[in-house]
Amino acid sequence: MLILLILYFLFLQLHIFDSFIKSIMYDIYIHYAICKFIFLLEIYKLIAMGKRKGQRNIASMKYHLYNKILNRKSFPAFSVMFDAGVESVLPTPLENIQIPLGINTNYGIAYASIISSLLSALNNLAISVFNPNFNSQTFLNLGQSANFGISNGISLLNNYTSLYDNYVQLCNILYQPAVFDETYFDLSVYQPALATEYQNQSCKKIEQYFSSLTTTNVSVNVTTLGTGITNIPNVDNYMYNNIADTGIIDLLNALNINFNQLPDFAKFIIAFIPDLNSIINNGFALDVGWLDRCVLAPETQNGIQLQNGMILQYFADVFGMILDYTPLDFAVLMPEFNPENVTQDDLIAILSADKTVISIFGNLFKMHLYDPSPGGINIAYSSEIENYAVSYQQFLQIQKIVNKKYSNIWYAKMVASATIEIARYPYQQNYSYTSGKRTLSYQDFLNYWKTKWKFYGLTDQDLQYAQQLGEQLQGQAKIENQIKLAQKSAKTKQYKPIFYYKNFQNIAVR
């Protein structure tokens, strides 16, 4: 009996011990599971919330895109970027306009492509006359067709204008009627008419065609560019004197063409060139940051005053000049209205007109990324697009340096942005044309720079760090100036475009 009691006692102790062990193991298991969960949660936070984006940030994506363009791998990418950027460069008050469903505000952009392509066609004509041995292989590298002769001007106009008229008629208003679809069991479902969907798809295809016009290598016969010929001596003399010092008069003389015998439309296009050339020559520069700036800033005596205190000359004049000289009746785009009683339709019309004007200028800017191009001595090696790539590459370098110093990602981004403003200050932007006052003096710039970034929350110590780091990197901008100067100097000795002044000495020659 005693033995049984002892055995029972031992069994009970073992059972209690086993339960105790199991309890401890269970607690350890629960503790391990909790720790593992917390660890995984923290890892997730590091990945999802605290991870620096690295190669996925905006600057990196832009840099890689520009780098592809620089390497001739995907040149049309810039065109896509610009077309998407038309919305972003609209003036701030127009950004908040609520456009009703079905209203198309893009049909003016199609017209902008026509104006730009005509200027490009005239420039191609000048190239074929002045540079008969010009290597057309550049076009093929850019995905453009080679030059296969001179197109008839009136045929070119008829093709453009008939397509444009059809586009406006078809796509001015994109209706989206709701029709009941009996095949759906849910009686609340309404579908747009199938024909309307096809029509809208057709409009998109026509828009794609217009966007391709500016990349088409077409030369045009200027004597057939129009039908009617009207001789008004005062007007003709004014236009002739206006082109006297430009490359267009050399082109007419080389072709043995009398200006007064040209069709009216050809006279308009020719008169358009020196005015645009004059504006560019007087200080407007195709520099790195124009797409990021407000395009309708208030005018000052020397140009327009941007919000950051910089002066950009004659930018707004480009838009006014295009509106003044354009042959298109803009009444449809920008009708007269009472400024004290502006309706939504008025605002939509203004929005359409602004998008048109911005597109005309933007398409001219795109042409500067081709070689040959109106505007001239640019881009044999895509030097303008190289500036974009270099800027974003430098920003990434600065960002990596700053990230090691600051744990707060967003604060580090501000320090990096402040640093690159200092680093890029010596870059002189534009060597193609004479240019006036471009920016503040360095000391005035530093005063403005410190005030701005203090307002954004940077401390004096961090501003001093950003200034020192930026000034250490200013040598890169100076080297870029030397490289660009050498490129322009070599190019101006052999290339003679339509946009140039006779006896003009650019900075490469001076």
UniProtKB/Swiss-Prot annotation:
Transmembrane segments: 28-48
Compartment annotation: Host membrane
Membrane topology, as annotated: Single-pass membrane protein
Highest taxon of the lineage: Viruses
Keywords: Host membrane, Membrane, Signal, Transmembrane, Transmembrane helix
Signal peptide span: 1-19
Outcome when changing T419I: In strain: Isolate variant XX
Cellular component GO terms, alphabetical: host cell membrane; membrane
Principal location: host cell
UniProt keyword Membrane present: yes
UniProt name for this protein: Uncharacterized protein 510
Taxon lineage: Viruses, Adnaviria, Zilligvirae, Taleaviricota, Tokiviricetes
